Amino acid sequence: MESTDQNNSIPEEFYSFNTGQPFCECSDCGKDLLEPGVVYVIEKAIRQYAGYTAKDVIFEVAICLECVERIKDEISAESMRNMMKFYEEMMMNGAQVEPGDSLTKCAATGTPRKELTNYQINALCNGTELSPLQPPYLISGEVLDEMNDILSDATRDFLDDYQQKFIGPSPEWITDDVPGGRFVLI
């Protein structure tokens, strides 16, 4: 029988690219994220190059749950309905990815990570640990583009403004030829 004392530490691939350390404050409000009981999400968009081991972090963000809720309040009702429908379809028709494989293939399509050019990894965290409520997961850039396509113009504009204000990257990264390079908050 497997031990229930698993290591729930946040994996290093969810550490800040800039510091090599765990995110310590909310990218939006500056709240201390490493306190026990502080729930937050980490979202990183990554571009990898075929035939190379090099990867670029397109953007990374750690946002406390309070700020996530505030961001969700800015999303139009139309976009929320479209996203809920998209998530339901993805869960019903998506790939069956085992929890231990959640970062090795796209949760929606099952496409192996090594075959993807662009993808986002996401984790729900509580202080210095992964939350047991949801395993980390990976979504391909193509699926993120599908999600972006169902957002209203107002929501897309809000998220683009949010990305530029709090996350970056430089505008040349946010182009139509970089799948999954837009902030979607998944």
Where do the protein language model's features map onto the residues?
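Short metal-binding segments enriched for Cys and/or His
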Residues: T53-M83, S131-L159
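Long, contiguous alpha-helical scaffold regions
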Residues: E88-I186
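Phenylalanine-focused residue identity feature
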Residues: F14-F17, F23, F59, F86, ...
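Compositionally biased, flexible interaction segments
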Residues: Q6-N7, F17, Q21-G30, E78-N82, ...
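Short Cys/His-rich Zn2+-coordinating modules
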Residues: E2-F14, K44-G51, M83-A95, N122-A123
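N-terminal intrinsically disordered, low-complexity tails enriched in polar/charged
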Residues: M1-P22, A54, F183-I186
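Short recognition patches in nucleic-acid-associated and regulatory proteins
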Residues: G20-I58, D101-Y137
